[in-house]
Amino acid sequence: AMAQVMKYHEWPEAPTPVIPAYQTTSFEFTVPQLNATTFRWNEMQNTYEQEDDGDAVAELMRYCGQSILSDYTKLSTGAYTTDVAIALTKYFDYDKNLELKYLEYHDISEWENIIYDEIKAGRPVFHSGYSLGGGHAFVCDGYDGNGMFHFNWGWGGSHDGYYKLS
């Protein structure tokens, strides 16, 4: 979801700083430092015919994962949503006034207005949800005018569609 929002904005334009190495929590292996890079936005597509065609988006996703200290297991990748906002400003030159908002501090009407205003302004919204069993990050990128919001779940189009926020 983080990479999808970054691709939408095609930002940053300038090279990233070095992203330091860290040790994962589950298997305690060291993820090596990533050197500064400039993302190749023009090479990123929505679909790919050849495996090598995805190298540019794979690089973006690797930098996103490392910037938020992702933990990797055989079945999943995990990170904290709060780390996304930190990484966007620290490593990817996003506005320091970027806000992280939580539904639990708003009623549903306020939340719909917040999301609608972002979509109307041309800004897809990074979302996440979680339970005791795990979580998932996804993107809200549209509104139908009838109280339904479009979500991209990040599963190659599977289950993407319009849903109520409630």
Regions found by a protein language model. Give the residues of each.
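Second-shell loop/turn segments in exported
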Residues: 69-77, 102-105
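Catalytic Cys-His active-site segments of thiol-dependent hydrolases/isopeptidases
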Residues: 146-165
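Sec-exported extracytoplasmic/periplasmic mature domains
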Residues: 2-11, 69, 89-94, 120
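Active-site nucleophile-adjacent alpha helix/oxyanion-hole segment immediately C-terminal to the catalytic cysteine
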Residues: 1-42
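Active-site nucleophilic cysteine motif
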Residues: 1-7, 53-57, 72-88, 136
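N-terminal leader/propeptide and maturation segments of large enzyme subunits in energy/redox metabolism
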Residues: 45-48, 67
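Active-site-adjacent substructure of cysteine-protease-like catalytic cores
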Residues: 86, 90-152
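Flexible glycine/proline-enriched surface loops and loop-helix/loop-strand junctions
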Residues: 60, 64-72
